């Protein structure tokens, strides 16, 4: 890709538009600035903003096939080489307010040695972190370094979320040891989050591994080494995800067993109560018929005697159940 003027990258809809100064900082893109590999430009767009969508459709600084991909719908992480540039799709943990972390956010990047164009549909915290480092003069110095920094920030957020899920599983395990059944749906949500992460982070790990192995002209050997380390770290996170999924299966079985045991105890208690009061129910039904000849019907203490007999009968049945070790 030949050098071009900064005015070709300027438009009102950009979220961020800066030129890397090659020293870890950034400067605004000027109309007369020449974009080259020593000072690549970074253009961050929100593809839902009409001005950005129009610019992507009209610009000549990227190939036609890239325009559609940068403004497209969410897909799984992947990497595609297109001539001198590379098109990369990655996923970020959703750290926006009032959003679940497992509702992952997509970031699409077209990157060359002179140009970085990234697009989003929802805010991505990793982008803001890289921008903060650049404003403080501690950011990436070139295109390859920028990509490694983004991959590292995304992986940091993923690792933190995996650790949070791990802690939640430990809390559930501790509750079960204390015979406490977790709230309805809590385990199902954790399991869903684990599965979603597993689905998208596996291809993302593969993307990082492929980038580290590709001989991309705009990446230094040190950047490739760091990218491989990031891929390895994400791979270890995926192993933790697999272990966590297995643990949730055990937890589900334990919860089912605990609920079944509680139900059995209640059923057993009701059965014992039925056994205790069955004889008394029979006698009260028998003596309650409106027929003549009921024993003690005319005696002044007949009702008291009958109640005392029922108490003795209940006590006898309870003693028998206790002796038989049913109680």
UniProtKB/Swiss-Prot annotation:
Keywords: Cell inner membrane, Cell membrane, Ion transport, Membrane, Transmembrane, Transmembrane helix, Transport, Zinc. Residues 293-300 are periplasmic. It is found in: Cell inner membrane. The chain crosses the membrane at residues 272-292, 301-321. NCBIfam families: PRK09546.1. HAMAP family: ZntB. PANTHER family: CORA FAMILY METAL ION TRANSPORTER (EUROFUNG), ZINC TRANSPORT PROTEIN ZNTB. Zinc transporter. Acts as a Zn(2+):proton symporter, which likely mediates zinc ion uptake. This is Zinc transport protein ZntB. It comes from Pectobacterium atrosepticum (strain SCRI 1043 / ATCC BAA-672). The lineage of its organism: Bacteria, Pseudomonadati, Pseudomonadota, Gammaproteobacteria, Enterobacterales.
């Amino acid at each position: 890709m030949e050098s071009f003027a900064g005015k070709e990258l300027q438009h009102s809809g950009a979220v961020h538009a800066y030129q890397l100064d090659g020293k870890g900082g950034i400067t605004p893109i000027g109309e007369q600035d020449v974009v080259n590999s020593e000072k690549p430009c970074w253009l961050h767009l929100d593809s839902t903003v009409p001005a950005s969508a129009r610019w992507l459709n009209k610009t000549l600084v990227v190939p036609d096939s890239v325009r559609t991909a940068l403004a497209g719908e969410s897909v799984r992480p992947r990497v595609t080489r297109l001539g001198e540039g590379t098109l990369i799709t990655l996923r970020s943990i959703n750290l926006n307010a009032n959003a679940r972390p497992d509702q992952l956010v997509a970031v699409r990047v077209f990157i060359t040695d002179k140009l970085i164009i990234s697009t989003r549909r929802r805010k991505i915290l990793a982008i803001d972190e890289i921008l903060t480092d650049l404003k403080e003069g501690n950011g990436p110095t070139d295109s390859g370094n920028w990509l490694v920094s983004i991959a590292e920030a995304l992986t940091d957020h993923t690792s933190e979320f995996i650790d949070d899920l791990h802690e939640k599983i430990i809390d559930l395990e501790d509750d079960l040891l204390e015979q406490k059944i977790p709230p309805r749906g809590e385990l199902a949500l954790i399991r869903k989050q684990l599965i979603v992460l597993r689905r998208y982070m596996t291809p993302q790990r593969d993307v990082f591994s492929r980038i580290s192995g590709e001989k991309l002209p705009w990446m230094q050997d040190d950047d490739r080494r760091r990218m491989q380390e990031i891929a390895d770290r994400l791979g270890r996170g995926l192993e933790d995800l697999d272990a966590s999924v297995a643990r949730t299966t055990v937890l589900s079985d334990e919860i089912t067993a605990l609920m079944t045991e509680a139900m059995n105890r209640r059923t057993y208690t009701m059965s014992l109560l039925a056994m205790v009061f069955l004889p008394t129910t029979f006698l009260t039904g028998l003596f309650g018929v409106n027929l003549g000849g009921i024993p003690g019907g005319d005696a002044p203490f007949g009702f008291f005697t009958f109640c005392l007999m029922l108490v003795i009968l209940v006590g006898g049945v309870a003693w028998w159940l206790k002796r038989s070790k049913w109680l």
